Amino acid sequence: MEKPVVLGTLGTVYGIKGWLKVNSFTDVAEAIFDYNPWLINQNGVWREIQVSSWKRHNKGLICKLDGIDVREDALALTNVEIGVAADLLPALPEGEFYWRDLIGCSVVTTKGYDLGKVTELMETGSNDVLVVEANVKDAFGAKERLIPFLEEQVIKNIDLTARTIEVDWDPGF
């Protein structure tokens, strides 16, 4: 099985009937419930579980999972990751990408200099930022570069098949 896409985590237990708080990583928090069944990561093993009910509670979300009917069963699920199969995510329009697809891509300047590989992305408010781990023998001595994800200005081309991102960026920066 391909590693699921993590959309959130289960939080603390709520009440005595097996309800759990939900920490959603989706842009719209409630969108995590658009996917059913969930895959949960318990002790490194992903297993499928159905969401039987959910609701807003105070400023957060809580859910009831099939087969989890008492507080003690719910306690075993606190802090586990919630994932879904990647093929359940909606297709994106041309030119848009999921962050998970960009992680691991090589980043190369328009002049052919290999800057390294994308290890993560950060949301800064004004624009997203690629975190690029530099190659071991980087000529500029860089260990990591933060490159703004500004299409057309900085990001010139993304080829997911070749797993490369071409950027207009000074390697010394």
Swiss-Prot record:
SS bond list: none
Alphabetical list of Pfam families matching this protein: PRC, RimM
Top-rank taxon, per record: Bacteria
GO CC terms: cytoplasm; ribosome
InterPro entries on file: PRC-brl_dom (IPR027275), PRC_barrel-like_sf (IPR011033), RimM (IPR011961), RimM_N (IPR002676), RimM_N_sf (IPR036976), Transl_B-barrel_sf (IPR009000)
Protein's cellular compartments: Cytoplasm
GO biological process: ribosomal small subunit biogenesis; rRNA processing
Chain's role: An accessory protein needed during the final step in the assembly of 30S ribosomal subunit, possibly for assembly of the head region. Essential for efficient processing of 16S rRNA. May be needed both before and after RbfA during the maturation of 16S rRNA. It has affinity for free ribosomal 30S subunits but not for 70S ribosomes.
Free-text domain note: The PRC barrel domain binds ribosomal protein uS19.
Subunit details: Binds ribosomal protein uS19.
Name this polypeptide is given: Ribosome maturation factor RimM
Species this protein is from: Aeromonas hydrophila subsp. hydrophila (strain ATCC 7966 / DSM 30187 / BCRC 13018 / CCUG 14551 / JCM 1027 / KCTC 2358 / NCIMB 9240 / NCTC 8049)
Encoding gene, per UniProt annotation: rimM
